[in-house]
Amino acid sequence: MRIRIEKAKRRLSLWQGRQCLYRCPVQLGRCPVGPKRREGDGRTPEGAYRVCSRNPRSKFYRALGISYPAEPDARAAFREGRIDRDALRQIESAVRKRVRPPWDTPLGGWIMIHGQPSDGRPVARDWTAGCVAVSDADMAWLFAHVAQGTRVIIRP
């Protein structure tokens, strides 16, 4: 099973082999074009990740944590001097162990697929800090059907 998020189409789909099991609209980070490069840039990452955590009591209804940053994100950042060797090694180790990578590096973290704000406030089209938001009804379905470790592909 895998989740595919197409940023330009604002769409999430859940696939089992060649069969699409579920599809829903998404809202992205407040700066939706381009890959995430650093903490606070408001961008949603692009690349291959995994669901690395599940939160049934998120302040955004429910949440599935995404394993950003992944090795390609970390290697590019190291080459460009945006993270040090220690941060690179920590991220590589987490990826090998299939656990949550460190979310406190200069690359940012805490990227989730989640529901809507619990305070009921209206939100803009793309309003998150870099996460992927769906309706609470869509999040309930996804949370019931998506296991930890599921692949997540985020495309431009």
Residues covered by each model-derived region:
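Core beta-strand residues in small-molecule sensory/regulatory alpha/beta domains
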Residues: 13-15
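Exported/periplasmic cell-wall-interacting domains
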Residues: 53-156
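A short, polar/proline- and glycine-enriched secondary-structure boundary/capping micro-motif
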Residues: 24-25, 34, 74-76
